[in-house]
C-alpha cells in the first residue's frame, strides 16, 4: 500500500504554492483574471468571515466514528467561477467542510440534500435565491447565507450577505485555527441511481488520491510540501480548461490538482450550459493545453464546434475524460479533429477518488480497459478475497490505501461499501471488473444499472456504446424494464442528431454488428433530449421511467 511520512492539509499546500508563484494566474474566466496571491487572499477573507460566524470544527476526529462529522458543513450551490474555488479553499482554511450542491435539483431534492448534510452555511448564486427561499423555513440549522451576485437581478434573501461584502468585512488574515489532516472534504454522490450520499474524506487522503498529492508522471506520493512547491514552481503553468460543473467531484479534483501543481484554470464564460463555440474560442484566446470533459454528452458538441473551424485549437494537447463513458466512435472523432492530441480516460468515483487511466492516440483508440493505480484491485464476488491478475472471474473494482472514512450518518452503508478483506480496508462502490493477466483492469459497468435478462448480466455501457456509434444518434442511455419472459429486457432511450431520421429497426441492426443477440435492445424509445446531470452523467432513474412508459 502506498504511504508517505508527511500528513498534508490543503491550506498548508495551497499557501506554500501561492507563496512560490504569487503572480502566476490561477483563474481565468473571460475578463476576470486572478493570480495565486489574489485567490489565496480572497479565500482567507472568506475563511475569516466563516470563522466570525462561529463556524469551524467542534469535535476532533479521534472522538468520532467514521460516519460522524464534527465540523460545520458549507454547501456550494454555484456555477463555475473564482467564487467556487475560493469557497473550497476558504472552507478548508476555516476548518469547515465544503460539499457540493447540484444546481439542477428541484425543491424536494434540494431540501433532502441540505437536510441530510445538516448544513449550517450555504454559498449560492443569486439565480438560485428563489429556490433557497422556498426551503429555508424547513432548515433551521442553515443560518449563514452568502449570496453571489449575478445577472439574474434577484435581491438578497433576508438574513443573507453579499459575497463580496462578506469578504470586505473582514481581515485578509486567515482565522487562528490549527488545521488537521483529519479535517473533512465532503462529496455527495450524484443520486442518479439512488439517493445522494455524503462521502466523508480526510483532507490528507483526498489530497493523496485526487488533489495532486502524487507525482503526475510517476504516480509516486509526495514526501513533503517543499517537494510539491518545487514541482509547481518549476513547471510551465499549463492552462487547463474545465468544462464540467464544479459540483461534480472530478471537476473539483482537477481544480485542486491544478492549484497544487502550479497550473492555470480556465473556465468558459458561459456557465449555465455548455456553449461549445464559446469553449473553442476560449481555447484559442488563452492557448489552452488541456480540456476536461464528461463523456459523449460534452465531447460531441466539442467535436462539432471544432469541425466548424471558427477557432484555432492547435494548442490543445490533451482531452481528459472522466465521470461518464466516452465511446470509441466519439473518441475517434476527437482524435481526427485533434490529430496532435491524446485522449485520456480516467476512472474514479466519489468513494475511491482517482483510480485508473487509459490513453488513446491516433491509430490506438480503445475504451473499457485501464492501467490500474498502485492501490486498485478486483475483489471476489463475495468480497472474501482479492482476485489475482489473470483470474477469469468477474469481481468488484476495489480501492485500498487512501479511502474515505464513510458515508455521513450511515454506519450500515459505510460497513457495506468499505469492507475489510484479508485485514485491509477497501472501498467497493459497486463497479464490476476483471483483472487481466497483463495487469490491466477491464471495467464492465456499475452493478446497480446492470440488466439481468434471462439469467444473463447485460452492462448498459456496452449497449450504449453500440447504439452511440450510429451517425444519426446524438445521445443514448440504456435501461431495463420488466419482462414476463426474461425478467428484464433492454430498452435504449435515444435522442437523434438534428435533421437525422432513423427507425428502431435500423438502430438495432446496427447494434447487432457488435453485440450478442441477447444484449440487443428489445425496444427503442425516442426522446428529443436525454436527461443528464449538469456534469453529463446519465440519469438512470429517468431512463428507467422512459423505458417503462415507452
UniProtKB/Swiss-Prot annotation:
Description of how activity is regulated: Inhibited by 2-hydroxydodecanoic acid, a typical inhibitor of medium-chain acyl-CoA synthetases.
Pfam families for the chain: AMP-binding (PF00501), AMP-binding_C (PF13193)
GO biological-process terms attached to the record: fatty acid metabolic process
Function in brief: Catalyzes the activation of medium-chain fatty acids as acyl-coenzyme A (acyl-CoA). Shows maximal activity with saturated fatty acids of medium-chain length between C6 and C12. Has lower activity with tridecanoic acid (C13), tetradecanoic acid (C14) and with unsaturated fatty acids like oleic acid (C18:1), linolenic acid (C18:3) and arachidonic acid (C20:4). Shows weak activity with some aromatic carbon acids. Involved in the metabolism of fatty acid during mycobacterial survival in macrophages.
Pathway the protein takes part in: Lipid metabolism; fatty acid metabolism
Subcellular location, record wording: Secreted, Cell wall
Signal peptide: 1-19
Keyword terms: ATP-binding, Cell wall, Fatty acid metabolism, Ligase, Lipid metabolism, Nucleotide-binding, Secreted, Signal
GO molecular function, one term: medium-chain fatty acid-CoA ligase activity
Organism: Mycobacterium avium
Reactions mediated catalytically: a medium-chain fatty acid + ATP + CoA = a medium-chain fatty acyl-CoA + AMP + diphosphate; hexanoate + ATP + CoA = hexanoyl-CoA + AMP + diphosphate; heptanoate + ATP + CoA = heptanoyl-CoA + AMP + diphosphate; octanoate + ATP + CoA = octanoyl-CoA + AMP + diphosphate
InterPro entries recorded: AMP-bd_C, AMP-bd_C_sf, AMP-binding_CS, AMP-dep_synth/lig_dom, ANL_N_sf, ATP-dep_AMP-bd_enzyme
Protein name, per record: Medium-chain acyl-CoA ligase Mig
One cellular component term from this protein's GO annotations in UniProt: extracellular region
EC number, UniProt record: 6.2.1.2
Database matches in SUPFAM superfamilies: Acetyl-CoA synthetase-like
Protein family per UniProt: Belongs to the ATP-dependent AMP-binding enzyme family.
Gene3D superfamilies named among the record's database cross-references: 3.30.300.30, N-terminal domain of ligase-like
Enzyme class name: ligase
Induction of its expression: Expression is induced in human macrophages. Induced by acidity. Transcription seems to be maximal between day 1 and day 5 after phagocytosis.
Amino acid at each position: 500500500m502506498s504511504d508517505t511520512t508527511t500528513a498534508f492539509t490543503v491550506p498548508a499546500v495551497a499557501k506554500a504554492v501561492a507563496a512560490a508563484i504569487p503572480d502566476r494566474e490561477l483563474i481565468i474566466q473571460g475578463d476576470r483574471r486572478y493570480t495565486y496571491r489574489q485567490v489565496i487572499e480572497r479565500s482567507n477573507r472568506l475563511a475569516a468571515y466563516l470563522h466570525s460566524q462561529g463556524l469551524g470544527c467542534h469535535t476532533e476526529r479521534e472522538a468520532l466514528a467514521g460516519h460522524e462529522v464534527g465540523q460545520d458543513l458549507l454547501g456550494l450551490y454555484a456555477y463555475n467561477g473564482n467564487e467556487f474555488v475560493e469557497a473550497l479553499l476558504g472552507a478548508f482554511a476555516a476548518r469547515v467542510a465544503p460539499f457540493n450542491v447540484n444546481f439542477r435539483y428541484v425543491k424536494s431534492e434540494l431540501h433532502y440534500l441540505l437536510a441530510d448534510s445538516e448544513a449550517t452555511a450555504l454559498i449560492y448564486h443569486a439565480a438560485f435565491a428563489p429556490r433557497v427561499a422556498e426551503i429555508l423555513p424547513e432548515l433551521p440549522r442553515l443560518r449563514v447565507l452568502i449570496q453571489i451576485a449575478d445577472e439574474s437581478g434577484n435581491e438578497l434573501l433576508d438574513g443573507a450577505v453579499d459575497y463580496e461584502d462578506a469578504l470586505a468585512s473582514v481581515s485578509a488574515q486567515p482565522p487562528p485555527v490549527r488545521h488537521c489532516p483529519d479535517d473533512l472534504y465532503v462529496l455527495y454522490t450524484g443520486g442518479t441511481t439512488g439517493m445522494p450520499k455524503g462521502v466523508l474524506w480526510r483532507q490528507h487522503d483526498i489530497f493523496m488520491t485526487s488533489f495532486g498529492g502524487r507525482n503526475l508522471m510517476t504516480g509516486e506520493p509526495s514526501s513533503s510540501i517543499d517537494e510539491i512547491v518545487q514541482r509547481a514552481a518549476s513547471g510551465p503553468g499549463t492552462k487547463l480548461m474545465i468544462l464540467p460543473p464544479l459540483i461534480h467531484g472530478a471537476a473539483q479534483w482537477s481544480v485542486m490538482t491544478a492549484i497544487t501543481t502550479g497550473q492555470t484554470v480556465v473556465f468558459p464564460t458561459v456557465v449555465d450550459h455548455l456553449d461549445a463555440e464559446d469553449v473553442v474560442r476560449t481555447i484559442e484566446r488563452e492557448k489552452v493545453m488541456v480540456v476536461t470533459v464528461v463523456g459523449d454528452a460534452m465531447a460531441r458538441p466539442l467535436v462539432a464546434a471544432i469541425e466548424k473551424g471558427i477557432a484555432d485549437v492547435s494548442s490543445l494537447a490533451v482531452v481528459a475524460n472522466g465521470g461518464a463513458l466516452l465511446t470509441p466512435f466519439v473518441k475517434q472523432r476527437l482524435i481526427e479533429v485533434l490529430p496532435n492530441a491524446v485522449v485520456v480516460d480516467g476512472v474514479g468515483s466519489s468513494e475511491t477518488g482517482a483510480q485508473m487511466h487509459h490513453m488513446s492516440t491516433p491509430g490506438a483508440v480503445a475504451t473499457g480497459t485501464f492501467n490500474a493505480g498502485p492501490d486498485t484491485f478486483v475483489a471476489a464476488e463475495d468480497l472474501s478475497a482479492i482476485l489475482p491478475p489473470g483470474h477469469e472471474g468477474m469481481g468488484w473494482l476495489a480501492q485500498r490505501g487512501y479511502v474515505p472514512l464513510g458515508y455521513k450518518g450511515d454506519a450500515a452503508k459505510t460497513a457495506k461499501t468499505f469492507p475489510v478483506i484479508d485485514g485491509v480496508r477497501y472501498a467497493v462502490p459497486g463497479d464490476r471488473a476483471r483483472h487481466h493477466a497483463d495487469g490491466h483492469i477491464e471495467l464492465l459497468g456499475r452493478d446497480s444499472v446492470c440488466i439481468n435478462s434471462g439469467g444473463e448480466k447485460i452492462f448498459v455501457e456496452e449497449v450504449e456504446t453500440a447504439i452511440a456509434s450510429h451517425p444519426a444518434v446524438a445521445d443514448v442511455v440504456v435501461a431495463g424494464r420488466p419482462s414476463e419472459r426474461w425478467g428484464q429486457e433492454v430498452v435504449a432511450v435515444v435522442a437523434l442528431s438534428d435533421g437525422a431520421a432513423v427507425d428502431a429497426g435500423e438502430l438495432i441492426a446496427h447494434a447487432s454488428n457488435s453485440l450478442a443477440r441477447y444484449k440487443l435492445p428489445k425496444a427503442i424509445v425516442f426522446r428529443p433530449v436525454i436527461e443528464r446531470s449538469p456534469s453529463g452523467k446519465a440519469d438512470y432513474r429517468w431512463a428507467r421511467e422512459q423505458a417503462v412508459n415507452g
